[in-house]
Regions:
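A membrane-interface helix-boundary motif in multi-pass transporters
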Residues: 1-5, 212-231
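C-terminal membrane-cytosol helix-exit motif in multi-pass small-molecule transporters
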Residues: 5-25, 235-242
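A late C-terminal transmembrane helix in Major Facilitator Superfamily
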Residues: 183-219
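Transmembrane alpha-helical cores of Major Facilitator Superfamily
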Residues: 48, 95-102, 129, 194-202
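C-terminal transmembrane helical hairpin of 12-TM major facilitator-type secondary transporters
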Residues: 121-175
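Helix-to-loop junctions at the C-terminal end of transmembrane segments
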Residues: 107-120, 215
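Juxtamembrane intracellular "pre-TM" segments in multi-pass secondary transporters
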Residues: 19-44
Length: 252
């Protein structure tokens, strides 16, 4: 399953290159130049942090609410926690799941505005740090809730942290969009935006699958800890490429 996506992407690009002819071939060749630019790959990862997280968590949040908080996690006679008893005080995913994506979408223009004022990469750096903290904290709250007979007691903290994740990803979506426009010239900015958006959109598949798999393994917190590690690595990547002394473009 995990090999299918890169294989499909690679096959699609190969078919585009081999079947192009005439003027189309020249245009394709120019667009493919972005793959030889290291900043394309750096910005792809950073856009996964922002847009990929936004769309991925939009899909995964209802699942997490339903499974983690919709069940009372009670120990049996042998002391093994069972995840089968319905929680009568469970919060409704339909009531709450829309709040995070709404906040993330609403706040995105603010991210672009702030990035125009202080620079895109510094904004991306700040929101990446916030996402490291929030993702790790959500993981810990998941751990507590998934071992509790009354998981609803942790729900408000869980939702607050997830809304923070959505807000940070929304702001970062605006800042990374701005950074791409500064780093690349007009002929490459469009293809890079298309490429990064397409790859980041796979977050809608990856986040629910990862969180769902970890819930099935009774360790939902590991999914969020893993995301926190990824965000931390991308925070270092952003600093190395765009904020350190001698960067190719400082704070684009």
């Amino acid at each position: 399953m995990w090999l299918a996506m890169p294989l499909i992407i690679a096959s699609t690009l190969l078919v585009m290159k081999l079947t192009a002819f005439g003027t189309m071939k020249e245009n394709i060749a120019k667009q493919f130049e972005i793959f030889g630019n290291k900043h394309t790959w750096a910005m792809t990862l950073l856009y996964i942090v922002t847009f990929g997280s936004f769309i991925g968590f939009s899909m995964a949040l209802p699942l997490a609410i339903t499974v983690i908080f919709g069940i009372s996690h009670v120990s049996d006679a042998a002391g093994v926690i069972q995840h089968t008893l319905k929680n009568p005080n469970a919060p409704s995913a339909l009531t709450y799941a829309w709040i995070g994506p709404f906040v993330g979408a609403l706040i995105r223009p603010l991210g672009g505005w702030i990035a125009d004022k202080v620079g895109g990469s510094i904004v991306t750096q700040v929101i990446s740090a916030v996402m490291v903290f929030a993702s790790a904290a959500v993981g810990y709250v998941m751990l507590l809730a998934y071992r509790s007979a009354t998981p609803e007691q942790y729900f408000l903290v869980f939702m607050g942290l997830f809304v923070l994740l959505f807000a940070a990803s929304g702001i970062g979506n605006g800042s990374t969009f701005r950074t791409i426009g500064v780093i690349f010239d007009r002929t490459q900015a469009g293809p890079v935006l298309g490429w990064t958006s397409a790859i980041a959109a796979y977050g809608a598949f990856i986040a629910p699958v990862v969180i769902g798999a970890q819930i099935k393994a009774a360790t939902p917190e590991l999914a969020m800890y893993g995301f926190a590690v990824f965000y931390a690595l991308c925070l270092v990547l952003n600093w190395w490429f765009y904020l350190r002394k001698g960067a190719y473009v400082k704070n684009p």
